[in-house]
Structures are given as structure tokens and as C-alpha cells.
């Protein structure tokens, strides 16, 4: 079963695209914050669990899936299904994630108020207000390139 996955162009396109986007995201954040931390636990956490930022790994992964289906099977039913889910995922990276970021801000404000009024110890929620267009576009480009590299090399 593992060998079947490791020889499947669709799976490999998604894997290469997702990991590439996350590694690039780590590089971008390192340059922005000027903090380089190379411990294995930190790297694994950043590469596999970090959300938000440049580029969008969700956009890159769903684009890689759609593109690799188009390249291996043509523009048929499977491609249309993958494309529909890709468009939903990409759309939600703007809208739904924006609203969850707004809600996180309200919850953080409420948390601070409760902390002051009744001395409850709380933890701030990470606020990510969706992706910017350039983050999603960069993710899409990474997805297309990843699919081409996996399917044609």
C-alpha cells in the first residue's frame, strides 16, 4: 500500500506541493522575523502544522491535485470534481478564514476582559484573517509547478 502511494503521481504531486509551500512559508517567516530556529521539533511543527501566511499550502495542494489529474487523466469527470473542490477550498481561504480571524479577535478581547474582571488565566487564540490574493496565487503557482514536475520528470 505504501509503495502504491509513493508511485502515485496524484499523491506525490500533493505531497511535494504541500511540503514545498510549507518550507517556503518557513523561509518567508524566517526572513520577516529574522529568527532562525533549526531544531527538529520546531521545523516539523512549522512545516506540518503552521497555517496562514505566504504561500497558501491549501491552495498549492488542491491545485496540484487538480493539475495532476488533468495531466494524467485529461479534462474529464475526475478533473471537474477536483477542480470544484479546489475552487471551494481556495474561496474559503479568503472568506471563511477571514471570519474565523475576526471571531478570534473578539474571543481574545473577551478573554482579556475576563482575565481582568474575574482573574481567569487564558491563552490568546492565533488570529489569521484569511489569505491575501498574492499568497493564494503563489500557492496556485507552486501547485501547478509541482504537478508538472512530478508528472513529467
Give residue spans per PLM region.
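Interfacial loop-to-helix junctions that mark the boundaries of transmembrane helices
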Residues: 2-8, 73-74
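N-terminal signal-anchor transmembrane alpha helix
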Residues: 6-29
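Membrane-embedded helical hairpins/re-entrant loop segments and their flanking transmembrane helices
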Residues: 29-49
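Membrane-embedded catalytic cores of phosphoryl/pyrophosphoryl-handling enzymes
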Residues: 19, 23, 42-153
Amino acid at each position: 500500500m505504501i509503495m502504491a502511494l509513493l508511485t502515485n503521481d496524484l499523491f506525490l504531486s500533493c505531497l511535494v506541493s504541500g511540503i514545498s509551500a510549507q518550507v517556503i512559508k518557513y523561509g518567508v517567516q524566517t526572513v520577516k522575523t529574522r529568527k532562525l530556529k533549526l531544531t527538529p521539533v520546531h521545523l516539523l511543527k512549522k512545516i506540518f502544522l503552521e497555517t496562514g501566511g505566504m504561500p497558501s499550502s491549501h491552495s498549492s495542494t488542491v491545485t496540484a491535485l487538480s493539475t495532476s489529474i488533468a495531466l494524467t487523466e485529461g479534462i474529464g469527470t475526475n478533473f471537474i470534481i477536483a477542480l470544484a473542490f479546489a475552487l471551494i477550498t481556495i474561496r474559503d481561504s479568503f472568506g471563511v478564514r477571514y471570519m474565523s480571524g475576526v471571531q478570534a479577535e473578539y474571543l481574545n478581547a473577551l478573554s482579556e476582559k475576563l482575565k481582568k474582571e474575574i482573574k481567569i488565566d487564558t491563552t490568546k487564540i492565533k488570529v489569521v484573517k484569511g489569505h491575501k490574493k498574492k499568497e493564494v496565487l503563489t500557492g496556485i503557482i507552486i501547485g501547478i509547478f509541482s504537478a508538472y514536475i512530478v508528472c513529467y520528470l
